[in-house]
Amino acid sequence: MRFLLIDRITELVPHKSISAVKNLTLAEEYLADHFPGFPVMPGVLMLETLVQAGGWLVRYSEDFAHSAVLLKEVRAIRFNNFVSPGNTLKVDLTVRKQDGALWEFNGTGTVNGNSAVSARICLEALNLADRNPELASSDSARTESYRNIFQQIWTPPA
């Protein structure tokens, strides 16, 4: 199963910051098991929402030069509140440091202004062909796919 957890990017400043939202609905299949009778977004998916938002900032900042943006490290993660169906998880990330392919962020997720998750994350941008030249065509296909998704979730201000 593939999770696209960013419904909309609300603010984007290349190389600096991103804000985005995830609207949680009962249609999310994983809620049937997490937890029966008390559906809440799993903490790992709250973290993944931060990771995906950071990935969009990296891709946009680098004009989609890399086909993969992967989680390298998580530090100081805190889960403070539940995210329930009907809630909107608003995530905000700011760049702490960027060194070559590595991007470090401070990230927070809030529901109605109350902290739900916070973490420091490190992401690595790469192309599959860097590790296996036979995967160059996969890089192109992935990049094109990400560009198409990005156009659906981000509308630049007029």
Residue ranges and their predicted role:
Residues F3-L5, L89, W103:
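Hydrophobic core residues within well-ordered beta-strands of beta-rich domains
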Residues I6, L71-V74, E104, S118:
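Hydrophobic residues on conserved beta-strands that form the core of alpha/beta folds
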Residues I9, M41-H66:
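Active-site helix/loop of acyl-thioester processing domains in fatty-acid/polyketide metabolism
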Residues P14-H15, P85, R96-A158:
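HotDog/MaoC-like acyl-thioester-processing domains
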Residues V21, D92, N106-T108:
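Beta-strand residues in well-ordered beta-sheet regions across diverse protein folds
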Residues G54-K90, A116, E124-L126:
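Hydrophobic beta-strand-centered segment that forms part of the acyl-chain substrate-binding groove
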